[in-house]
Regions:
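Detector for outer-membrane/organellar transmembrane beta-barrel domains
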Residues: 84-86, 104-105, 111-207
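Surface-exposed coil loops of outer-membrane beta-barrel proteins
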Residues: 3-22, 30-114, 124-131
């Protein structure tokens, strides 16, 4: 799919193919469709919000979402042993990046575990590890995103999440950051919905 606008200018500033939103292919590796592989510019496996506002509970995106990837470029392997469990592994070009920044930068790695106890409840845990630019040099970044998406009734839905990351610095110091958030949405009728978001973001070293 293609894209343009201020979102593209902000999030794809250093990319030559910035007008590509998603471009990937996938295939199942077995007849039972438990194993699959996808390759290309993929939707981000981190977080519960997308760049398309109407798919989120609130029209404005959370600080947590704005400071984590909206897309990833690389390879995804998924194993889905049942309707409840899903396990994925990723090899990517890095944190929200289509092109690799430098030839000597190794690929980044990630994982995703999803547990869907019912059609109304999903718990998801995603991780990322890779070298990212800290303002001076490329150093290691470790990141974890955990959230619970629960639909309580045909009117109430909540999402609670927690991000925690660590960026190593060139002077052997570390720069941690974290962000808890809770979002609730109430459906008034078929035409109207209301939502409330409470969040906290701490990044004392401006990672």
């Amino acid at each position: 799919s293609l894209q343009s606008g201020t979102y593209v200018d902000d999030n794809y500033a250093n990319e030559k193919m910035k007008n590509l939103n998603e471009a990937y292919v996938g295939l199942f590796l077995d007849q039972q469709k438990k194993h699959s592989v996808e390759v290309g510019i993929l939707p981000s496996y981190i977080g519960f919000e997308t760049a398309v506002s109407h798919t989120n509970l609130t029209l404005t995106r959370s600080l947590l979402a704005e400071n984590s990837p909206y897309f990833m470029t690389g390879i995804k392997y998924n194993y889905k042993p049942s309707d409840k469990w899903s396990f994925s592994g990723f090899v990517t070009n890095g944190w929200q990046r289509i092109q690799k920044p430098e030839k000597d930068i190794p690929p980044a790695f990630g994982t995703q575990i999803s547990y869907k106890s019912s059609s109304n409840s999903v718990v998801n845990w995603s991780t990322f590890i890779g070298k990212e630019f800290n303002g001076m040099d490329y150093t290691m970044r470790y990141f974890s995103n955990l959230y619970w998406d629960k639909t309580w009734s045909n009117k109430w839905r909540t999402i609670s999440g927690l991000d925690y990351g660590i960026q190593t610095l060139s002077n052997d110091d570390t720069a941690p950051w974290f962000s808890p958030v809770i979002i609730t949405q109430y459906t008034i009728n078929s035409k109207w919905q209301s939502a409330f978001r409470a969040e906290y973001y701490q990044d004392t070293k401006n990672t």
